[in-house]
Structures are given as structure tokens and as C-alpha cells.
Amino acid sequence: MRHATLLSTLLGLGLMTQAPALLAKNLVFCSEGSPAGFDTAQYTSATDNDAAEPIYNRLVEFERGGTAVQPALATRWEVSEDGLRYTFHLREGVKFHGNKTFTPSRDFNADDVLFTFNRMLDENHPFRTAYPTEFPYFISMGLDKNIAKVEKTGPLTVVFTLNSVDAAFIQNLAMSFASILSAEYADHLLAQGRPSDINQKPIGTGPFVFQRYQKDSQIRYKGNKDYWAPEDVKLDNLVFSINIDPSVRIQKLRRNECQVTLHPRPADLPSVKADDKLQVLQKPGFNLGYIAYNTQHPPFDRLEVRQAMDMAVNKQAIIQAVYQEAGQTAVNAMPPTQWSYDTSIQDAKYDPEKAKQLLKQAGVKEGTELTLWAMPVQRPYNPNAKLMAEMLQADWSKLGFKVRIVSYEWGEYLKRMKNGEHDIALIGWTGDNGDPDNWLGTLYSCDAIGSNNYSFWCDPQYDTLVKKAKQVTDREQRTQLYQQAQQRLKQQVPITPVAHSTVNQPISAKVNDFRVSPFGRNDFSGVSVD
């Protein structure tokens, strides 16, 4: 019966056209949302990055399931004594993918690295002029200001020159936004007058070749037979089956209609763990679910109002109802597993009566209306944003606010929040590179406004600490600076940290060597299916 179910599923997904295809190794991943595109430099959402992950490589990459950086398209690199010059030696013989309209005429080389980064650095770059877009990660980390130039000193050698020391530079280059694109493909698209195809018909060097994408349905890839690390390609076909409903994803996993899924409902975990055909991979969450107060919208431009909102949040009730056994109360602006976390910081005591007094002192009138934005999708840091929003609505209604819950499709939600349309929003983050700057700089700095700083909070004292910490290479000194920054942020309350969730990843017992990423990535290189 299980064989018949798998057969019908493969037929439905178009993975079989004739009998011999039964021998093919296929894996279906029940994903949680539709990506906006595949040009990773444009996006910060894990949904977008997951969809692009099979297609691309970067100069350096994180080891599967870990945080260590290892060579990828660069086989080695050197750093100058002053920490300002990084010389990368590129891998020889790496092939780009092709598609129906493009066949590469050469292997990967330094020109591709220059195109990838100069497009983000140069506002007048020809491709950027033809296809204007934003680069939120690149800008929020200040790389647009700190990378002075990128040069090639040979066909397989590239030098990055920085304006100031960046202790996280190598880790940053392992992130999705730094995926290497084909300069030749970009030239082809410009000549054809179709530059936006770089986002919808992606070409990379990665272990899987993009085939096609149907929004709200599926993404199809095939194994890259020319991959430079052939041992990492153990699947003939990879399919993302898009299902926003977590209960549907689990049902499909039970029926073997998919072999890997994500973000299960806490209530489903006991039965999944009891099923001998399934397994649940578990890892402490390197994540944070939080409430962002738009400090440019009155009355949240006033500290005492933000303090009042913060102390009126019943975190324990939220943890029990929303996260159940898979969540821990968050106190700080990053998870406790992140080095430099300040254990001395404590939450304000839950005190609705004191919150009312603060609001009265601030002159906030009873009946003041506000919008509370709730994510439409389940995220690793928030399994049920709708329920959390309803609980916050009840908490803040007791203070006299009229709270209206707002939601949009996930891509639209992020876009509108970056424009600052919200009063208060539910959002979160899963760490990308293991460095504190990926939290304290990427999410809360002045440079991150318009990208990942959804509080629109810009504090010069805080910013000075974070920037200084990034320019110091001694970890003890960096820790001291980052702890001062955490204390300043806690005092100013641009956010209310709510919870860190344990990552639970249900997969079929037939799946081999799938590794849960601390950064929330779903990486299918090296994965096989019995």
C-alpha cells in the first residue's frame, strides 16, 4: 500500500513519465510557503533562501548541520595583517547550470564574483540599472559602505578590500545573500531584455538545477550531474511541495507523499514521534520570536509607552498556549546559545497595573487605536502568530487600547513592514552565521532600518557599541561591547523578546543524512532516500 501511495504521489508531481523512472531517487520536501523569487540578494526570509539554497554556492559555506565555515567556490583565502584585504583563490572547473534559453560557454571564474558583488555595491551598475532592486542583508550589515572594492588579480583570484576591519566578514560571505551568480547569464539576460529572469529563472553552480516553479504549488529541481562535489548529489529529483497548513504537511508525511517537512504544530509532535515510519530531528533553537514597536509611530516613539506595552505582555501564558513544550521564555535580543549573551539582563516584571500608570503619565488616552500585525505563516520562532496576536490583543485591551489585528500574504507582510506601515508587529529571526552582529547589527542597528530593523529604532549610543564590536577581533573585547549594547537595547525597549523555540524537524525514516541546521536552513546536499 505504501508503494502504491508513493507511486501515485510521484505521478502527481510529474516525477515519472515511464517505468524506468521508478529507479530514480526522488525526495519531496513539504515546505511552508511560496518564495518571492530566487535571487537571494533581494530577500531575508527563510522561505526564499530555502528555495534558492539547492541552486547556488558561495565562496565559503557553513558545514552541513553546523556553524564552521569551510571552502566552497573558494578553495582557500588569506587575510592581510591589517585585516583589510581578503584574497580568495577560486575553484577550477566549476560548471554553471543551463536552461532552455542559456548554455554557458565557460566555467566559473573571477568575473562571476565581481558581478555578484559589484551589482550590490554600485548603484549605477548596468544590471542594477536595468533591474532595480534592494539588497537588505548587504545593506543592513553595512557591507555596501565597508567593502571599498572587489578586484580580480587573475582568472581565479579575487581580492576584497575593506574600509575597516570586519570580524564577521568570512561568516557573512557564507550567507545566502552572497550566492554567486553567472556574469555570462546576466549579460545574456541584458541582451535579451529580460533581466528579471535572474530572479525567476535562476542559474547557479549548486547541487540541484532549477526546473520550474508554480506559486502555491511546487518547485522542481533535478540533481546536477556536473556538480563539482559529486558525492553531495544523491537525489535525481528534488521537489518542494508548498503547503501553508502544518497539519496538511504532517498528513502528507504520514502518507509518504513527502519525506521531509518543517514547523510542525506542537500538538502533532507526540503522535509523529510514536510513528515508527517517521522520526523527529531536534535541535535547540538558535532563534527569537519578538514584538517590534514602530518607534516612528506615536505613541511608540516614547520610551515609557514601550515600557508599558512590554510589562503588560503575559509571556508565560503565551509560552504555554502558543509554544507548549517547544518554547522557552526569551529575555534578551538574541538567544542564550549565542556567544556574548548577557546573562545579567532580566525582564521587567509582568505588571499591568504599573503599565496603566505609565500610560496615564505619558498622556495616552483610553481608546487609542493601534494595529498589531500577525504573520500569516508558521515560522520556527513562532508556531502560531494568529493565536499570539489574539493573546496580545487581550493583554493590551486591558490597558485601554483598541487593538486591530492585521495580516497579509508573507511576502507582502515583509514588504509593508519594511516600509514602516505597522504600529506593532510580530516577527522573529533565526541566526544566519553564528556571530552576534547577525543579531545586534542586522536587526536593531541604524543601518538596518528599511531592511530588518522593524522597530525603526536608531540609537547613536547603541550603534556606536555595535560598530566598534564588529571592528575588534579579540572575542573578549567584542563580548564586553556587545553586552553593553544588549543592556542599552533592553533599557530602550524597541522590542519585547517573547520566546526561543526548539526546532523539531519531522522526516521519513527512509531519509539518510539530513542534518538540522542551527541557522534554519533546509539543505539537501548529501541527503539520500532508501
Model-derived regions, located:
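Surface-exposed binding/hinge segments that line
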Residues: 89, 121-122, 126-186
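A structural "hinge/loop" feature
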Residues: 34-50, 73, 100-104, 167-179, ...
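Structural transition elements
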Residues: 208, 294, 300, 329-362, ...
